[in-house]
Structure formats: structure tokens, C-alpha cells
Amino acid sequence: MALPPAAAPPAGAREPPGSRAAAAAAAPEPPLGLQQLSALQPEPGGVPLHSSWTFWLDRSLPGATAAECASNLKKIYTVQTVQIFWSVYNNIPPVTSLPLRCSYHLMRGERRPLWEEESNAKGGVWKMKVPKDSTSTVWKELLLATIGEQFTDCAAADDEVIGVSVSVRDREDVVQVWNVNASLVGEATVLEKIYELLPHITFKAVFYKPHEEHHAFEGGRGKH
């Protein structure tokens, strides 16, 4: 099945290891299939992104070990141009159709959205709850801000935003913005930028948390 052309936008706690966890570990795959997305080819003259970004999919299992989280993670596609970004975004299920406890992530380069990854371990996330009727809007706006490097001036000189995530939960959904250096969070204006981008959204339970402060953090191994 050929992918339809991309629609260009206007300019501008972990469960103990066991059979139940193993049975639930498989994350859903986009209906078009990862194989078809892998067949995407950059278009001549495509607008390059400042950095490549990788879409990931997973399903969070309370109590899962770091190894189980890593094995549950599914790479969707690494995008390097604006056109390929929209081709992928438009051809994976909308976040509103994902099952409970599933998440999408967009991470810089090909780094994985795992707390204990060496390149992530000293960082953390800004985390906020989103009303379900606003999830799609918030996720899309954060994606565009991320690939457009709109957070570049919102982090300290030795820090950077390296990813965004959206997770489907019971009452409200959860969005997260990842940075690489938790010790410099006091100098960041990431939340101010998010409020500027989404002035009409009422976020709940907004806070920052270093990965190393999670009770399930397995330092040196490798999830959100």
C-alpha cells in the first residue's frame, strides 16, 4: 500500500517481571506498518531539519524493569526533512486513538526515550497533565516547536531540549519535554515557551523531575 502524500502545514510502578508483564509488553504498531514507513524516501529539494528526530512508540507497564521497557520500545521512523516529518505524522494513528498507557515520543537523533540511557541519565522532563480534548492540539504544537528548534533559546548554554512525549492515561493525558541537563533547569524558560505557544490550554500538575529521582531509575541500565 502506497503512503498518501504528506499534507504540508501552513508556513509559519513498574510491575515485577512475570508472565502478565511479558504478555502485555507488545506495543501496538501503526496500521500501515513500520515496513511501509521505512520505504519512505526523502524528496528532492525537501526542507532539511536542523537535526534529525526519531518517532518512537511504547506501552508503559507498571513495575516493568529497565530491560523490559527497552524491549517494549518500537522505533517508528527517523525524520530528516519537513516533508518526511509530515508523511510520518499523517500516517501513524492519531494520539487520541492509542490504547491506554501507550505513548508516542519524538527524540533528537536516534536516542531512545529511556531514563537510563547514557545520553539521557543526567537530564529530566517537564511534565504536565492535559485535558483529553486538548491532547491532539498540544501534541502537534509541541512537535512543531521541537523540530522547529523553538526551545533552543529556552535552555542554558550547556543544556538542550532533546525530546517530547505524549502518554495516554485514564483521566488526563500526559505530555513531557525532555532536556539533557537537570542541574541547569533553573535557567530554563521552557514552560514559559509552552504557555506562550498554547495560551488557551489549562495544564494540570505541572512540574520538573530529574530522571535520577524516579524510584524506578536503574542507574546505568535503561524509561519514562
UniProtKB/Swiss-Prot annotation:
Residue ranges, annotated region (Disordered): 1-28
Homology family: Belongs to the eukaryotic initiation factor 4E family.
Function text: Recognizes and binds the 7-methylguanosine-containing mRNA cap during an early step in the initiation of protein synthesis. May act as an inhibitor of EIF4E1 activity.
Keyword set, alphabetical order: Initiation factor, Protein biosynthesis, RNA-binding, Translation regulation
Name of the gene this protein is made from: EIF4E3
One Pfam family it belongs to: IF4E
Molecular function per GO: RNA 7-methylguanosine cap binding; translation initiation factor activity
Protein name as annotated: Eukaryotic translation initiation factor 4E type 3
Biased composition (Low complexity): 1-27
PANTHER family per the UniProt record, alphabetical: EUKARYOTIC TRANSLATION INITIATION FACTOR 4E RELATED (PTHR11960), EUKARYOTIC TRANSLATION INITIATION FACTOR 4E TYPE 3 (PTHR11960:SF66)
Amino-acid positions noted as binding mRNA in the UniProt annotation, renumbered to this chain: 115-116, 169-174
GO cellular component, one term: cytosol
GO biological process, one term: translational initiation
SUPFAM superfamilies xrefs: eIF4e-like (SSF55418)
Assembly information from the UniProt record: eIF4F is a multi-subunit complex, the composition of which varies with external and internal environmental conditions. It is composed of at least eIF4A, eIF4E and eIF4G. EIF4E3 interacts with EIF4G1, but not with EIF4EBP1, EIF4EBP2 and EIF4EBP3.
